[in-house]
Amino acid sequence: MGLHEAKDIESRFTRYVEGLVSVIGHADRAVPLHDYCLGLVMPGERKSVEPMAAITAPGRTAAQHQSLLHFVGQGGWSDDDVLGKVREMVLPAIERYGPIEAWIIDDTSFPKQGRHSVGVSHQYCGQLGKQANCQVAVTLSITNHDASLPVAYRLYLPKAWAEDDARRCKAKVPEDIAFKTKPEIALDQIRWAHEIGLPGRMVLLDAGYGHDSKLRAGITELGLAYVAGILPQTLVWKPSVRPGRTPKKGRRDAPNTTSVKDLALSLRARAWRTIEWREGTNEWLSSRFARVRVHVASSHERPGKPSKEWLLIEWPEGEDAPTKYWLSTLPSNITFRDLIDAAKLRWRIERDYEELKQEVGLGHYEGRGWRGFHHHGTMCIAAYGFLISERETIPPSGPRSAALLPQLAVPDSYRPRGSPLAA
C-alpha cells in the first residue's frame, strides 16, 4: 500500500471516529474513544487495555492506561447510542452489495478463570466445544451474502448470578437486569430490531435457539419468517395425520407424531437431491437435502390448527444418518435451492465471530464489571464496522487490520503485567 492510500485510510478512520464521538456526550471522551478504536484495529496479539496503551501512546503508557481503563470500564456513555451510530455509518457499505437479507441470532463465548468476572459460570462454551468456565454474549447481526454486522450485544447472566446480590453489586450489574434465558434475550433483541424498523424480514437461528418453540412462535407473531435449526428429536405430526388439539400438559398423542429424524429416515430415495451452494467467495459446496411440508407438534402454537412449514433435512453422502434439520416459515413456493441458500447463510455469523476475536480482540477484555464488558464489546463492533466499510481497500490475503494501518512501535521499556522483567 502506498503512502497516499495509507493517508486516505487514516483520514477516513478519523472521520469514522468523529461520527462515534458525536454520540458519546462529553468532549473529554473523544481522545480515549479514538485511541481505543485505534488500538483495536492496529496489529497486535493482545487487545486488552495495557498493550493498547503501549501501542497508542508509547511516550506516556501509564497515563494512557488509566485513560483507556476509565473510558471502557467506567465511562457513562451509551452502548445503544454508539451501536446505533455504527449501524448508521456502516449499513450503506453493506447494502452496496445488496439489501439486508436476514437477521442472525447466535451467541459467542469467552473462556475465563475464576468466578468474579461478571456472568462467568460453568456452562457450555462454544469456543471450546465443551462445558467450561466462561462468559456468553447473545448477539443479533444483520447480513446479506457479502457482509454482516452485529447490531445487538448482551451478556447472558446465569440464574446463580442474577440471584447473588453480593456479586451483582461488585460487578455493578444494573438493577433492572433480571434472569432471562438466552432464547428470551434473543427474542428481546428481535423485538427491538422489529420496533426500530431494521431492514430484513427473515431470522436465522441454529439449533441452540431454533429448538425453542416459544422463540419461534414469538418471531412468527412479529410477522417475520425464520429458518431455525432444530434437534433430531423434534416432533412433527405425521404427514398422513390431521393435527389435533394440544392437550393441557403440552404432550402429543405419540402414535400421531414422529421425530424429524424418523421422518427423514422414512423418506424415499427420490425425495433426496444433491444441491450446491457457496459461502462467500469460497468454492462451491454440495450435499444431499430433502424437504417436506409439516405441522410442528408444539404446545406454543397459536390456538387452532398449526400452520404448515418447511422441514429441511441435510444428509451428506457417506453419513449413517442426517446431520442437520431446519424448520422454516418461508413461503410454500420458495425454490429448493433458495431454501437451502437461506439456511446456509448462517455461515456469516461464524465469520463475524472469528474476525471480531482474531482481528479486534473481542475476547481480550480483562475487567470484571458489567459496564466494561459491554463497552469493550461495543468498541470492538465499532472497530469491526470500520474494517467492513474499508473492505474494498483490503487485499485478498493477510489480516485486515495489518493491511489498513501501519504498525506502531511498542516502547522498549514496555513490559506486560506479570512479566518477570516488569518493574
Describe the function of each predicted region.
Residues 105-109, 209, 256-257, 261-265, ...:
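Short amphipathic alpha-helical "interface-anchor" segments enriched in bulky aromatics
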Residues 40-44, 56, 72-75, 330, ...:
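Generic structural signal for hydrophobic core residues of well-folded globular domains
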Residues 136, 348, 352, 375-381:
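Catalytic-loop motifs flanking and including active-site residues across diverse enzymes
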Residues 132-134, 220, 305-307, 319-320, ...:
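A short, structural micro-pattern
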Residues 2-204, 208-228, 232-235, 242, ...:
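Conserved, well-structured functional cores that handle cations and Mg-NTP chemistry
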